[in-house]
Structures are given as structure tokens and as C-alpha cells.
């Protein structure tokens, strides 16, 4: 948590746990209850448990807290309506998900502490933020939840597989022994990690830099695999829903090298990954932007939207700026704190047909993305060798999202990575 936010909750004298965060997520007063209305509502951040270890650890811990347990979570616990409601209430305060906690740290460094009130992240990311990313504003402090937490290991294993011969296994043992012999507390701390045994961490893994070296005092137990699977299934149904507009370049250059056909397959896969409660719309742009489909719930509109995607064909110029501006305006008009609002734009070339300037577009994006985490985020894909990757990265930065680079061979994977935010 940003240190002032933690102190407002009584830290370090009073413990903070999942029960604290759940209570704040349910409160309508937000930080005004603690004399800080300028901090806005309580907003929580965690990564996607299907993509990220920290997100999975956080989600399991939430279910354990809801069930009042530290270990031994059962299928009945996960499926209990009371426990589902507890986790759902916390998830409704999420600003967005994602595949790495580093994105949260980068956004907090760029946009300030009101971007998110608390984030489930590894201690190493807290230290990285305080010692590398922070350029001003409060530091982050690592808080071990009073209910308990997990250690995240980085295991080294030698697969028991036909392609691992005796020489390979012997070489792996040499590497393993060398790593173990060299992994002193000092070496681990250089990368902001704790030592691999019970030895206490050393600087810079210390309280002066935001770490919690005397924690954790309680550890949680991971449930068995079938319970983990049930947690993921429940999270999919209960996570904060998204409202996304997909903007697709259909200019004449998209006919080259089968780019449009590959992009359509990427969009198809993206739409199929979203949950029934999510809403997705589609717009295309060439000489001018055109709305193909307003956002519709995937529960009822998925098949119809997929059919519209497959009916697209390329022609004309590239009105990238106008398309992005108008898509963001449409989503912003509907935006609220009940959904993750975003625009995903793919383009293979430079803008040559827009009325709005690049500079004005950036201003508009900063206005709707804002410094608080509940704005509209813009994700961009620079598609193919002719794309303006740097320009699209600037658009994503202004829009509080992330920039990606892809081609016909990788575009499906790019859309999968973007789906982690929802």
C-alpha cells in the first residue's frame, strides 16, 4: 500500500488483513471515512490468477479469508454462496487485472498513489518500486495480511523426460550446486529477494526500503488441485466484468501478407476468452471510423459479434487517431466503477486520414484515463513491420494501458496477453 494509506488504516500499530480490505471494498465512504476524501474510493489491484502467481496466491488467500481458514480449503468452502459474495465484493473494487504486478507499479509511479489503494504484489516488486521506479510521492510499504500469506518460490527442476539424458542431468546438478552455494543472503538481496533458507534477509530487503523483514508470522496452506481449479472457475464468474471496444484497422494495407485474416483470428480468440458477463463492441477504421457493433454482453451476443468480425474486408486509408478518440469517447460515456472499461486498438500503419491531431488525442486520452484507476484504459497493437510502434506506445501510455507489438504469426498470443487485464 502507499504508506499514507496504510497509516490511515492504523499501520504499523494495527494489523491489516484481507478482512480490512473486504470491509473497505464494501464501504461507500471510501477514504473520506479516514479524513481523506481527496483519495477517492477504495480501489484494489491484483493480477489475473490464470496468468500470474501473485494473482493466484491473492485469490486463494481471499477464499481462505472468506472461509475463516488458513489451510484445508474445500470445494464446499469455494462454492458456499457466503464466501463467493465476500470475494465478489472485493473483486468489484478492482481497477483492472493483468499478467504482472510490474504494470501496477509503473502506473502508480506515473499517476500517483490514488491510482490504486492496495495491490497484491510480491515484496520484490515493492522494493523495485521504492528503489527504482519511484520519482516522487509516497513510498510503498509491504504488509503481510494478518490472516497469513504465501511464499512464492522459484524452483529449479530437472524434468524426468526422454530428452533429458545422463549428461544433461549431470550438467543440471552442477548448475544447481553452484547456485545453491552462491545464494547467500547478500546475493539474494541484490535482486531484492529473500534467501532460500530461514536466514533473515539483509539490506536492501529491510523496513527502510518498505519491506517487512520480520514478516510473515503466519503462512497459508495451498489447497489441493481440484480446489484450486474450483477457485479459478468461481473467479471467472465473480470477477469484475469488463466493457471493451475492439478497434481494428481495415485499411488497404491490411490485405498484405494475410494480415487482416490473421488479425480477425486474434480478435476471434480474444472474444472467446471473455466471460458471459463481459460486454464487447467492435469498430473498424480505414478512411473513417465505423461502429460495427455496440458493446453487447457475451452471454447473448458473442456468436453474432464473431460473425461480424469474420465479415470484415480491407480498403482505404488509416484514420487511427479519429478511431481511437471516438472509441474512447463511446466507452467513457458508459463508464462507471462497476466495470473495467477499455479500448483495444490494432493498426498496421501511420495515420493519414484523421481530423484530430496526435497531440489533441493524447490530451483527450489523459483526460479520460485520469490519475485514478477507474478511467478508460487504451491498449494498442503495432501490427506488422510497417506499424508506427513508438507512436502507438505513446497512445497507450497516454491512455493508461499497455502497448504491444505483433505480426501475423504472433497476433493471437498478443490478444491472449491483453485478455489478462479483464
Model feature map: region roles:
Residues 1-52, 60, 64:
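A conserved helix-loop-strand patch within extracytoplasmic ligand-binding domains
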Residues 61-144:
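Ligand-binding pocket segment of bilobal, Venus flytrap-like solute-binding proteins
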Residues 239-297, 313, 320-328, 339-347, ...:
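Von Willebrand factor
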Amino acid at each position: 500500500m502507499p504508506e499514507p494509506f496504510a497509516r490511515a488504516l492504523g499501520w504499523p500499530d494495527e494489523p491489516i488483513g484481507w478482512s480490512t480490505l473486504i470491509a473497505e471494498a464494501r464501504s461507500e465512504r471510501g477514504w473520506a471515512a479516514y479524513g481523506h476524501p481527496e483519495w477517492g474510493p477504495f480501489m484494489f489491484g491484483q493480477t489475473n490468477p490464470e496468468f500470474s502467481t501473485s494473482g493466484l496466491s491473492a485469490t486463494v488467500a481471499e477464499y481462505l479469508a472468506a472461509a475463516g481458514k488458513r489451510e484445508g480449503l474445500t470445494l464446499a468452502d469455494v462454492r458456499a454462496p457466503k464466501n463467493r459474495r465476500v470475494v465478489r465484493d472485493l473483486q468489484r473494487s478492482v481497477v483492472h487485472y493483468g499478467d504482472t504486478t510490474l504494470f501496477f507499479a509503473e502506473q502508480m509511479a506515473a499517476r500517483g498513489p490514488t491510482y490504486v489503494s492496495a495491490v497484491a504484489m510480491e515484496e520484490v516488486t515493492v522494493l523495485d518500486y521504492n528503489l527504482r521506479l519511484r520519482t516522487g510521492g509516497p513510498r510503498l510499504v509491504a504488509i503481510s495480511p494478518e490472516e497469513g500469506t504465501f511464499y512464492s518460490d522459484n524452483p529449479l527442476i530437472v524434468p524426468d523426460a526422454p530428452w533429458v539424458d545422463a549428461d544433461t542431468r549431470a550438467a543440471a546438478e552442477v548448475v544447481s550446486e553452484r547456485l545453491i552455494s552462491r545464494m547467500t543472503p547478500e546475493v539474494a538481496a541484490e535482486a531484492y529477494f529473500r534467501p532460500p533458507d530461514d536466514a533473515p534477509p539483509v539490506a536492501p530487503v529491510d523496513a527502510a526500503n518498505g519491506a517487512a523483514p520480520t514478516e510473515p508470522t503466519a503462512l497459508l496452506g495451498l489447497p489441493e488441485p481440484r480446489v484450486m481449479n474450483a477457485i479459478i472457475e468461481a473467479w471467472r464468474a465473480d470477477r469484475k466484468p469488463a466493457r471493451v471496444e475492439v478497434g481494428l484497422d481495415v485499411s488497404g494495407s491490411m490485405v498484405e501478407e494475410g494480415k487482416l485474416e490473421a488479425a480477425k483470428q486474434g480478435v476471434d480468440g480474444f472474444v472467446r476468452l471473455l466471460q458471459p458477463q463481459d460486454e464487447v463492441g467492435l469498430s473498424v477504421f480505414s478512411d473513417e471510423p465505423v461502429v460495427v457493433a455496440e458493446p453487447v454482453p457475451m452471454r447473448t451476443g458473442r456468436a453474432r459479434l464473431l460473425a461480424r468480425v469474420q465479415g470484415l474486408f480491407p480498403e482505404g486509408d488509416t484514420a487511427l487517431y479519429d478511431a481511437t478518440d471516438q472509441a474512447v469517447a463511446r466507452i467513457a460515456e458508459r463508464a462507471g466503477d462497476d466495470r473495467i472499461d477499455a479500448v483495444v486498438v490494432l493498426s498496421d500503419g501511420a495515420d493519414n486520414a484523421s481530423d484530430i491531431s496526435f497531440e489533441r488525442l493524447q490530451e483527450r486520452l489523459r483526460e479520460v484515463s485520469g490519475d485514478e484507476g477507474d478511467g478508460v484504459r487504451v491498449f494498442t497493437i503495432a501490427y506488422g513491420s510497417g506499424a508506427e510502434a513508438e507512436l502507438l506506445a505513446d497512445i497507450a501510455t497516454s491512455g493508461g494501458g499497455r502497448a504491444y507489438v505483433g505480426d501475423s504469426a504472433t497476433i493471437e498470443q498478443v490478444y491472449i496477453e491483453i485478455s489478462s487485464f479483464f
